[in-house]
Curated annotation (Swiss-Prot):
Membrane topology: Peripheral membrane protein
Subcellular location, principal: membrane
An annotated GO BP: positive regulation of translation
PROSITE patterns according to UniProt: G_TR_1 (PS00301), G_TR_2 (PS51722)
CDD domains reported in the protein's UniProt record: EF4_II, EF4_III, LepA, lepA_C
Recorded superkingdom: Bacteria
Protein name per Swiss-Prot or TrEMBL: Elongation factor 4
Organism listed in the record: Methylobacterium nodulans (strain LMG 21967 / CNCM I-2342 / ORS 2060)
């Protein structure tokens, strides 16, 4: 196979908000260039996980190579990198974008620009992309292409006069998109003679091949049998096979500059291949790695426990398998007095947490309980050291802590004008500070700084419900700030329940504690003795509810007779109850845990 002229290659990605038709457009492009026969076409070819298809989101970046003969008679190679659109996966997005020179910005002509479109477009602009706007769904009666064009120009500031109007569903005008890619996007640059330098875009685990690595060659040539070095992980491998995706794997002898393909090199674990790493030849390495590589840091932590303790080993095996495929997910063992053995897991964000939990339940048939999600706090100790706290139950003695810092995020919320008041109130209730508010057409764009701790519970659900689903939300972590945070413990019958302890802001502690106690009062079944349910900060009780005792009518056999006889029986019962309360164990049912952890409004 001869080397392709570099000016016939186009690497592009598609940037869009969820549901604006990104994967459908990708399907049409694949169909039109004849990469798959009609029989093999399924909806959303590139979203290979069931969960991706069902939720209509793209999680892992995928790629496909299309051959397209343009109207000028030349055959071009188009490498489409399908990027995730969701905020939790921004790092994956940035790496996919770094592998391309241009982007198609897909905007739904009936809905206009959304918050995540903005976030990803700005990333594309940061990566110096040429951007071609595409208006999708123009066959809908509600489509307003002119208004949306104007919106793109106002909000994003790119020229939308030549935006391509299409309908990905019906296949209308798709050819024009391909022509625009060829005409407007720049070809890649690269030097064949230079030492090998390639960007590791993504990696996943294949049962037969081991780890498959998706690469974009920047300089040099990657050949079969070469010995390569991953510069960030500092590991050396021999390349077994090289190929490209048309969406099916097809082997090739070599990949030249500007090309995108995959390699396998009997790598055992996905954790050894870090997204964004630089790959070079071991014998003749490149001088400097590619910029922008950073190890993935989990943001949200929560404990996952099997409902049935006997399932623990299965859970451990399942976690290991998922970790093979998703290096951004981390876990370690933990035990809890209330829930038994389980794992403390770290995630990129809430969607990531939901997806991992759903995949564990679905693909491995496990029943799981997850504890309340928490974020990573920084504790500045009195002796001058700094510790990270992942689990509120491990909090050291308050006297040894100087200050506690919590992560803050910068959130951008786009909402229709009618719901602006409720959205501002929600942000205010969550200890937010307003940074900016301006109007984009008929919609308000609000920028807020919020503590991540307040967002991880149910901020997203609340935002959707107060705006009837119209508000869209995007965030990135900005910095750590000192906060007046306290550890709230829940005591049942004067015994602390570790799985329910949490760090809260002092101003919110009382209301949160009271709500938790009320909830548990309804959920824990009554026992033969009275049970106090308390919320405490240190030694100070801030809220209490009492679960009444079930009492047996001991005086039922006394008909009439002396009052002292009845009193003797009642006193005897009282003594017994007192003893029970001292030694009695309160069993908290699983349902109570699940419901108490879900509670948060």
């Amino acid at each position: 196979m001869t080397a392709k002229p570099i000016d016939t290659i186009r690497n592009f990605s598609i940037v869009a908000h969820i549901d604006h038709g990104k994967s459908t457009l990708a399907d049409r492009l694949i169909q039109l260039t004849g990469a798959l026969s009609a029989r093999e076409m399924t909806e959303q070819v590139l979203d290979s996980m069931d969960i991706e298809r069902e939720r209509g989101i793209t999680i892992k970046a995928q790629t496909v190579r299309l051959d397209y003969t343009a109207q000028d008679g030349r055959t071009y190679i188009l490498n489409l990198m399908d990027t995730p659109g969701h905020v939790d996966f921004t790092y994956e997005v940035s790496r996919s974008l770094a592998a391309c020179e241009g982007s198609l910005l897909v905007v739904d002509a009936s809905q206009g620009v959304e918050a995540q479109t903005l976030a990803n477009v700005y990333q594309a602009i940061d990566a110096n992309h040429e951007i071609v706007p595409v208006l999708n769904k123009i066959d809908l009666p509600a489509a307003e292409p002119d208004r949306v064009k104007q919106q793109i120009e106002e909000v994003i500031g790119i020229d939308a006069s030549e935006a391509v109007p299409i309908s990905a569903k019906t296949g209308l005008n798709i050819e024009a998109v391909l022509e625009a890619i060829v005409a407007k996007l720049p070809p890649p640059k690269g030097d064949r003679a230079a030492p090998l330098k390639a960007l590791l875009v993504d990696s996943w685990y294949d049962v037969y091949l081991g780890v498959v690595v998706l690469v974009r060659i920047v300089d040099g040539v990657l050949k079969k049998g070469m010995t390569i070095r991953m510069m960030g992980a500092d590991a050396v491998y021999g390349v077994d096979r090289i190929g490209v995706f048309r969406p099916k794997m097809q082997d090739v002898a070599e990949l030249g500059p500007g090309e995108v393909g995959f390699l396998t090199a009997s790598i055992k674990e996905v954790a050894d291949t870090r997204v964004g790493d630089t790959i070079t030849e071991d014998r003749r390495p490149t001088d400097s790695p590619l910029p922008g590589f950073k190890p993935v840091q989990p943001v949200v932590f929560c404990g996952l426990f099997p409902v049935d303790a006997a399932e623990f080993e299965n859970l451990r095996a399942a976690m290991g398998k998922l970790r093979l495929n998703d290096a951004s997910f981390s876990y370690e063992m933990e035990t809890s007095a209330a829930l038994g053995f389980g794992f403390r897991c770290g995630f990129l964000g809430l969607l990531h947490l939901e997806i991992i939990q759903e995949r564990l339940e679905r693909e491995f048939n496990l029943d799981l309980i997850s504890t309340a999600p928490s974020v990573v706090y920084r504790l500045n100790m009195s002796d001058g050291t700094m510790r990270e706290l992942h689990n509120p139950a491990d909090m050291p003695d308050v006297m040894k802590i100087d200050t506690i810092e919590e992560p803050w995020i910068r959130a951008t919320i786009l909402t229709p004008d009618d719901y602006l008041g409720s959205v501002l109130k929600l942000c205010q209730d969550r200890r937010g500070t307003q940074i900016d508010l301006n109007y984009v057409g008929k919609r308000a764009m609000v920028v807020y700084d919020l503590p991540l701790n307040e967002v991880v519970f149910d901020f997203y659900d609340r935002l959707k419900s107060i705006s009837k689903g119209y508000a869209s939300f995007d965030y990135h972590i900005s910095d750590y700030r000192e906060g007046d945070l306290v550890k709230m413990s829940i005591l049942v019958n004067s015994e602390p329940v570790d799985a329910l302890s949490m760090l809260v802001h002092r101003t919110r502690a009382e209301s949160r504690g009271r709500a938790m106690c009320e909830k548990l009062k309804d959920l824990i079944p009554r026992h033969l003795f009275q049970i106090p349910v308390q919320a405490a900060i240190g030694g100070k009780i801030i809220a209490r509810e009492t679960i009444r005792a079930l009492s047996k009518d001991v005086t039922a056999k006394c008909y009439g007779g002396d009052i002292s006889r009845k009193r003797k029986l009642l006193d005897k019962q009282k003594e017994g109850k007192k003893r029970m309360r001292q030694f009695g164990k309160v069993e908290i049912p699983q349902e109570a845990f699940i419901a108490a952890l879900k509670m948060d409004s």
